């Protein structure tokens, strides 16, 4: 059942409130009695249950009051608006109860929220609506003329369907000179007439008499019924038949077959001839006795004519008459007691059943039912049970009522329905069993939050994606059902307030699909993470969250950028190489970076063009330009090299670096073309600026150290020296060239030539070819050594190791 259906969870219900509408709660176990006269028209008022329960009209309607009875026979109806209990139909006491007095119809009143039930009964009061009826309208009685006064002759009784005072009260006979009638009472309470002789008969005077027998009931006014009695005066017959015993008591099982011998009665007559011949018959037998038993008129055997039913008649009182041919008769009584056998299985009557039931409500009433067995004694005793492996409890109440309720809170996610079998067994031998199967459905309560399939998700997106690209999905499931299991997704506020999540991704609230809202740039944003929430639609709603990491995959969208040598058309970089250089001499190193990552940033170098092919070579992995052979005089003094720098992307991107190499015999008087003007500082990207600043700082520190050293040496020498001015290009030189993509920093020792100009107050100098080792923390580890090799006057060189 769906949580949106607003099911009323009936928790901790009052299960055993046996109060029925009284003034106090104590001592209310006795059922409340109501009465109605039989034959009252349908829809007649019986009582007002709302007043009896002490409930206001609104409360009465809210409690959902119901009236149920055994077998769900609807003799009563309840007006929910007024609380009036009305007759559903006209009641006939004789049809409902027969001769049973009092005639009581039991019913139950059920209330909900909380659950209660009460016992009640409706007594149907008899009215005198039936007259006495003689089954035999004519009776023949033979009386011997020698019968003395006071002799009694039993007559057949009348039947009256009414009970109590409306039943037969007495019998009267029409006026005559010989007989009167006495009203006798049997052990079962029924009354029968007995004809008593008051005056001796004389057949010669009067051979027969015709009398009218009248049966009167006790109603007001009384009703009556009549029968004709023919009295035949017979000649003297000295002896009447006599039974061996006047009273017989026998027991017979209710499952005895038809024609079963119940008992054999026997009578004798001491007369001889036809006066001694005896015949047997039922005397004053009711319609039920006549249908149930038969008597062999010659042998006196009493046999069954139909099947017995203990539940309808527990005993029969049968009168047997033995009559001789002379008209004399004798009477005996046979009391037949029916023995109950276990021939009725228990019955289960369901009064209330609730399904589905909420999963989180313990002690919720599921069903109210009653059990019964038409048998008696041990055969009518009942035990009731359910399966042991179910979370339900069966409690006994009053009047063979049972309540089935939940023992513990249920979990719909573990089990959504239960098949409950109510087993009712009597204690007979063998016992009979009745099974009642019920399917109890468990309604859902929003007690499970959505659960993501993963605690965290990692999504990969290639940069330069198209906007609205589906980049992945998150998924959450909810073990509940219905609207409680409908999951909606949302983006939670990012923990990083600077992350513009709303402009980066969006999520489909229904299926959890994630979309990139704009094109991503790996160089600007390599990765970001955010949280995704999943909420159900229960009331109240439950939610959970998961972490989503988005990794931007690099695309080869950046060409290599050459850091050194600087590519400036107005001030080309010129490297000096002595002609005496050995093969493998390090000319310079091309340093380049790539804004991409991974293999897109793996750079390789190759010599694209050269003035003298085969003179120089470029190492593919580190960009070092070295001499490939010995230099000769035939080699041009000026060499132009074009180095191709290519990444490993697909497709690859590339850049070129142009190098100018000047072959010199020595470093004393190198020739370097002066630039026309110092190049303006271009707009560089941030990485280039950082590297240039770092290089400039290191170079300045080194120049200061060299100047200090030179100044000290100059002070110690007295003679002046004249040296040629060295012309070098202006501009920044990198002090610490690093391949940021894994090519490594320069690892060779660097040789610096310092040229000083004579006659200058400041004695400027420039280093021409820095070959610096790895510098950690901008400190020089090895000590400086001075080379005492002088050229053209005053000159010196420094070497850093």
Swiss-Prot record:
**SUPFAM superfamilies membership:** Cadherin-like
Q: What is its main location?
A: membrane
Residue ranges in the Cytoplasmic topological domain are 711-801
Residues spanning the membrane: 692-710
Q: Choose one Gene Ontology CC annotation of this protein and give it.
A: plasma membrane
Subcellular location(s): the record lists: Cell membrane
**Where in the chain are disulfide-linked cysteines found?**
97-103
Quoted from the entry, the domain comment is: Cadherin 1 to cadherin 4 domains mediate homophilic trans-interaction, the interaction with an identical protocadherin expressed by a neighboring cell. This is a head-to-tail interaction, the cadherin 1 domain interacting with the cadherin 4 domain and the cadherin 2 domain interacting the cadherin 3 domain of the other protocadherin. The cadherin 6 domain mediates promiscuous interactions with protocadherins on the same cell membrane. Each cadherin domain binds three calcium ions.
Main function = Calcium-dependent cell-adhesion protein involved in cells self-recognition and non-self discrimination. Thereby, it is involved in the establishment and maintenance of specific neuronal connections in the brain.
Name of protein: Protocadherin beta-8
The record lists the organism as Pan troglodytes (Chimpanzee)
The root-end lineage is: Eukaryota, Metazoa, Chordata, Craniata, Vertebrata
């Amino acid at each position: 059942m769906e949580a949106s259906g607003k099911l009323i969870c009936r928790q901790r219900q009052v299960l055993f409130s046996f109060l029925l509408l009284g003034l106090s709660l104590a001592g209310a176990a006795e059922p409340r009695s109501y009465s109605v006269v039989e034959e009252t028209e349908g829809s007649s008022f019986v009582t007002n249950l709302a007043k009896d329960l002490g409930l206001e009209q609104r409360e009465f309607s809210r409690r959902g009051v119901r009236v149920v009875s055994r077998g769900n026979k609807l003799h009563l109806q309840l007006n929910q608006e007024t609380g009036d209990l009305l007759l559903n139909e006209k009641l006939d006491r004789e049809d409902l109860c027969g001769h049973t007095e009092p005639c009581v119809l039991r019913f139950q009143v059920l209330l909900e929220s909380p659950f209660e039930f009460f016992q009640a009964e409706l007594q149907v009061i008899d009215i005198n609506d039936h007259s006495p009826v003689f089954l035999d309208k004519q009776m023949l009685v033979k009386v011997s003329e020698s019968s003395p006064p006071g002799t009694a002759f039993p007559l057949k009784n009348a039947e009256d369907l009414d009970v109590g005072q409306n039943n037969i009260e007495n019998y009267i006979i029409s006026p005559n000179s010989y007989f009167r009638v006495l009203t006798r009472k049997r052990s079962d309470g029924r009354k029968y007439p007995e004809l008593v002789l008051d005056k001796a008969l004389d057949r010669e005077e009067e051979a027969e008499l015709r009398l009218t027998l009248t049966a009167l009931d006790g109603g007001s006014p009384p009703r009556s019924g009549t029968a004709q009695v023919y009295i035949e005066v017979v000649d003297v017959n000295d002896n009447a038949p006599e039974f061996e015993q006047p009273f017989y008591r026998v027991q017979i099982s209710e499952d005895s077959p038809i024609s079963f011998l119940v008992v054999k009665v026997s009578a004798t007559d001491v007369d001889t001839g036809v006066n001694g011949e005896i015949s047997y018959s039922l005397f004053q037998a009711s319609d039920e006795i006549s249908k149930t038993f038969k008597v062999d008129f010659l042998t006196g055997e009493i046999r069954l004519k139909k099947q017995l039913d203990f539940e309808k008649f527990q005993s029969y009182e049968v009168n047997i008459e033995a009559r001789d041919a002379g008209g004399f008769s004798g009477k005996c009584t046979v009391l037949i007691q029916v023995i109950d056998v276990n021939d009725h299985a228990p019955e289960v009557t369901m009064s209330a059943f609730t399904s589905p039931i909420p999963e989180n409500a313990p002690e919720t009433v599921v069903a109210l039912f009653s059990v019964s067995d038409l048998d008696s004694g041990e055969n009518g005793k009942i035990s009731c049970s359910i399966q042991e492996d179910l979370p339900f409890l069966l409690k006994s109440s009053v009047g063979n009522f049972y309540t089935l309720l939940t023992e513990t809170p249920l979990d719909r996610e573990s089990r959504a329905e239960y098949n409950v079998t109510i087993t009712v067994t009597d204690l007979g031998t063998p016992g009979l069993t009745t099974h009642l199967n019920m399917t109890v459905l468990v309604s859902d309560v929003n007690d499970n939050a959505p659960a993501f399939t993963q605690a965290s998700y990692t999504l990969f997106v290639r940069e330069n994606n198209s906007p609205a690209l589906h980049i992945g999905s998150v998924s959450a499931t909810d073990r509940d059902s219905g609207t409680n299991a409908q999951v909606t997704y949302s983006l939670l506020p990012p923990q990083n307030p600077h992350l513009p999540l709303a402009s980066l991704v969006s999520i489909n609230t229904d299926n959890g699909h994630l979309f990139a809202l704009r094109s991503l740039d790996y160089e600007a944003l390599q990765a970001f993470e955010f949280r995704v929430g999943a909420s159900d639609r229960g009331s109240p709603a439950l939610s959970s969250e998961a972490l989503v990491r988005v990794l931007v995959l690099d695309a080869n969208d950046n060409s290599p950028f050459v850091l050194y040598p600087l590519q400036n058309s107005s001030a080309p970089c010129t490297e000096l190489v002595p002609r005496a250089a050995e093969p493998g001499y390090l000319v310079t190193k091309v340093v380049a970076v790539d804004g991409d990552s991974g293999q897109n940033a793996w750079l390789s170098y190759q010599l694209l063009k050269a003035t003298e092919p085969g003179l120089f070579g470029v190492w593919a992995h580190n960009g070092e330009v070295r001499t490939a052979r010995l230099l000769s005089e035939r080699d041009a003094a000026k060499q132009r090299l074009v180095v191709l720098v290519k990444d490993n992307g697909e497709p690859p991107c590339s850049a070129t670096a142009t190098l100018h190499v000047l072959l010199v015999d020595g470093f004393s008087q190198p020739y370097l073309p002066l630039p026309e003007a110092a190049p303006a500082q271009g707009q560089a990207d941030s990485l280039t600026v950082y590297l240039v600043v770092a290089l400039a700082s290191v170079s300045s520190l080194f120049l200061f150290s060299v100047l200090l050293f030179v100044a000290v040496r100059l002070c110690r020498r007295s003679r002046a020296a004249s040296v040629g001015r060295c012309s070098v290009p202006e501009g920044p030189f990198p002090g610490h060239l690093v391949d940021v993509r894994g090519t490594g920093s320069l690892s060779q020792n660097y040789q610096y030539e310092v040229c000083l100009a004579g006659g200058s107050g400041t004695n400027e100098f420039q280093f021409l070819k820095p070959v610096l080792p790895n510098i950690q923390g901008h400190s020089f580890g090895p000590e400086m050594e001075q080379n005492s090799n002088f050229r053209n006057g005053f000159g010196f060189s420094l070497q850093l190791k």
